[in-house]
Amino acid sequence: MDQNIWEYDDFIFKGDELKGMTQKGKDKVKLEGKTDLVIPELTPDGLPLKKIGDNAFYRRGLTSVVIPNTVESIGYDAFGVCKLKEVKLPEALVNIEGFAFYRNKLTKVEFGNKVKRLEPSSFAMNELAEIAFPETLEYIGASAFYKNNFETISFPKSVTKIDMYAFRKNNIHKVEVANSIDLHKFAFEPFTAVERF
C-alpha cells in the first residue's frame, strides 16, 4: 500500500475532523483505481486527527483503509457500502456510529481497548464469522451485526445491553448471555438457544 499517493488536498478537513474527499481524492479512487486508503494522522494544521465524519467515505469503493491511532470517533455511515475486507480500529477509538461499516465485505475486525458502544447497524451486512470484543464494550446496538456469518459469539463482562436484531440473520445455534445483560428478546434468531447464567 503506497501511503505517498494520498495528499492533504485529497481530503476535506474541519478542525480535527476529516469530513470527506475533495474531487481530486474522489477521482483518485474512481478514475485511477486507488482503493487502498491511508488516512493521514495529522490535519493540515498539524492537529492530531480525532474524528472521521459522517458519510466521509460512503460508497467510495475502498478495498482497504489504514485509520490512524489518534481517531476517537468514526461517524455515521463513514465507511458504509464500500468493499473493505478487514479493518484494524484505532487504539483511541471510543465511538462507532450507526452504519459506520455497513455493507462491506469484512471478515476481520480488530478493536482497540476503548470502544464502549457499537451503534445500530454499525457492522450489518458483512461476512464476519468471528470477533473479539474489547473488555470495555458496553452496548451492542440494534442490527449491529445483522446478516453476518457468525456461528458462535461470546461477550465480555462489560456488556450491559444487546439490542433488537443485533445478531439476526446469523447462524448462531447456541449462545451464553450473562443475566447482567439487558438482552432484547429479538436480538438473535428464533432458533438460537440462549442460555442465561
Residue ranges and their predicted role:
Residues 54-55, 75-78, 97-100, 119-122, ...:
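Consensus positions within tandem repeat domains that build extended binding/scaffold surfaces
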Residues 3-19, 28-51, 60-73, 82-95, ...:
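Structural signature of tandem-repeat unit edges
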